[in-house]
């Protein structure tokens, strides 16, 4: 069958906006180069016309300059169209990208809403309130337990007069022990506030043998 009717030509992939913009920019660059060359030719013709006397020669130069100028105008118009097309495609690309981002955001929001809806079915306000009450009960019980454990276990009723009498007895005993310790020390170890008495004696001079 393919031999009789032939094959369909392969389908070319559709160019993206980015590829189309790049192609337009390259064409614009090429046209700008051509316009620059025509400007250079016009400059040369202007010099030649200025240096040529009026007559057939100058008329021919002017005619050639007019042709170059006409080509320049055509290329300038073409360049303007290419730049406008490129600008329009850039705007379309930006709009397309913005729409993609918007759609992605909407899809994300829809998925989030779906998950929240699914999860909210498993959440009961009554269960949460009951759980909070239970937690509060546990905390209150723990606070009471800590309060009991923190009570002073050495709170014994003692008469203050007995404590004063015992303290006075301890002071008297300490004073008596101090006196006994002083009595047992030798006299030379006892502190004294008197100055020592020294015997001043004259030292005998040695006799000189005659």
Swiss-Prot record:
UniProt-listed Pfam families: Snf7 (PF03357)
InterPro entries recorded: Snf7_fam
GO biological process: intracellular protein transport; late endosome to vacuole transport via multivesicular body sorting pathway; vesicle budding from membrane
Sequence segments annotated as region (Disordered): 1-21, 168-210
Coiled coil: 21-175
UniProt keyword Coiled coil, yes or no: yes
A GO cellular component entry from the record: fungal-type vacuole membrane
Polar residues: bias regions: 174-184
Keyword line: Coiled coil
Family from the record: Belongs to the SNF7 family.
Protein name from the UniProt record: Uncharacterized protein C162.06c
Phylogenetic placement of the source organism: Eukaryota, Fungi, Dikarya, Ascomycota, Taphrinomycotina
């Amino acid at each position: 069958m393919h031999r009789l009717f032939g094959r369909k030509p392969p389908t070319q992939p559709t160019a993206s906006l980015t590829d189309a913009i790049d192609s337009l920019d390259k064409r614009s660059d090429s046209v700008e180069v051509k316009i620059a060359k025509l400007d250079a030719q016009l400059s040369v013709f202007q010099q030649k016309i200025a240096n040529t006397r009026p007559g057939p020669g100058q008329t021919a130069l002017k005619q050639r300059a007019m042709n170059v100028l006409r080509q320049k105008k055509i290329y300038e118009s073409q360049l303007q169209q290419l730049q406008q097309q490129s600008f329009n495609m850039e705007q379309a690309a930006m709009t397309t990208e913005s729409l993609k981002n918007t759609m992605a955001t909407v899809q994300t929001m829809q998925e989030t809403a779906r998950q929240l809806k699914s999860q909210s079915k498993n959440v009961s306000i009554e269960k949460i309130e009951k759980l909070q009450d239970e937690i509060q009960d546990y905390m209150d019980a723990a606070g009471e337990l800590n309060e009991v454990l923190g009570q002073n276990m050495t709170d014994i009723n003692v008469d203050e007069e007995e404590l004063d009498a015992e303290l006075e007895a301890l002071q008297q005993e300490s004073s008596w022990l101090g006196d006994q310790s002083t009595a047992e020390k030798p006299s030379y170890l006892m502190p004294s506030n008197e100055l020592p008495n020294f015997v001043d004696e004259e030292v005998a001079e040695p006799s000189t043998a005659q």
